[in-house]
């Protein structure tokens, strides 16, 4: 799989599976935080931060949903890459419907933004990316953390007085997000990219066991973490909404 190695684009540098054939997801590399504190390293400010996404990506989708539900469209701008990722990686294709140019720097490829943030970066070029236009760098490329920042750091600029990480349910939200990540959110990829039959069987079994579990949970309560809509529901939704169209066939998640 394609990636940057010491800042150079390589098309043969990343194996998607480990020695046992199991899908091996690289951890997100940029993990700074935007905070409501004006004295923070990355203080929340309207118009300062920019979000790079692909509509094809469930991880990016969850940040877009949180941004929209909070009413942050005017506070955090967005650029949308081409959903078809070729050998050159995520590309800006403004001529394609639903895609945009890079509104910050006019880059041709998302990897150029990674190279700006770290000229010696080694790793995969992924979405979403939260960009600081003032410091000209990546703040964060971990979707769960970007969701949390949008929900907790930008209230001053949100047009909707809602939270998806409510007091009194935070432990339940964190537990639900952790519980669905490996078997469901990442599980569809573990099935689709498995390099051995054993790795595939393990992934698809855990996936459908988890779906059965959460169906039982939702038989007794309205949402995953209790009576209110939270980040956990958004995280589950972006996988489920793609299940029939993509994962059932393309990723072989078709046990049922």
Where is each model-derived feature located?
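Local sequence-structure signature of Cys/Sec-based thiol-disulfide redox active-site neighborhoods
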Residues: 35-89, 227-231, 247, 251
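N-terminal regions that are enriched for targeting/export leaders
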Residues: 1-43, 47
């Amino acid at each position: 799989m394609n990636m940057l190695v010491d800042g150079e684009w390589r098309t043969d540098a990343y194996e998607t599976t480990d020695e046992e054939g199991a899908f091996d997801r690289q951890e997100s590399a940029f993990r700074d935080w935007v905070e409501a504190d004006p004295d923070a390293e990355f203080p929340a400010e309207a118009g300062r931060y920019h979000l790079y996404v692909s509509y094809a990506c469930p991880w990016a989708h969850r940040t877009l949903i949180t941004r929209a539900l909070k009413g942050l469209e005017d506070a955090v701008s967005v650029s949308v890459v081409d959903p078809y990722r070729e050998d050159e990686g995520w590309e800006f294709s403004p001529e394609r419907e639903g895609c945009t140019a890079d509104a910050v720097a006019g880059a041709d490829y998302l990897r150029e933004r990674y190279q700006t943030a770290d000229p010696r970066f080694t790793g995969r070029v992924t979405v979403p990316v939260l960009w600081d236009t003032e410091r000209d760098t990546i703040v964060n490329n971990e979707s769960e953390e970007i969701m949390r920042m949008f929900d907790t750091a930008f209230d001053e600029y949100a047009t909707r007085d809602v939270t998806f990480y409510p007091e009194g349910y935070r432990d339940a939200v964190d537990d639900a997000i952790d519980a669905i990540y490996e078997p469901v959110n990442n599980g569809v990829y573990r099935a689709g990219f498995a390099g051995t039959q054993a790795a595939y069987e393990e992934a698809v079994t855990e996936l459908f066991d988890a779906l059965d579990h959460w169906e039982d949970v939702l038989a007794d309560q309205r949402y995953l973490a209790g009576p209110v809509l939270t980040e956990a529901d958004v995280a589950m939704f972006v996988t489920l909404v793609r299940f029939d169209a993509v994962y059932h066939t393309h990723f072989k998640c078709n046990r049922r």
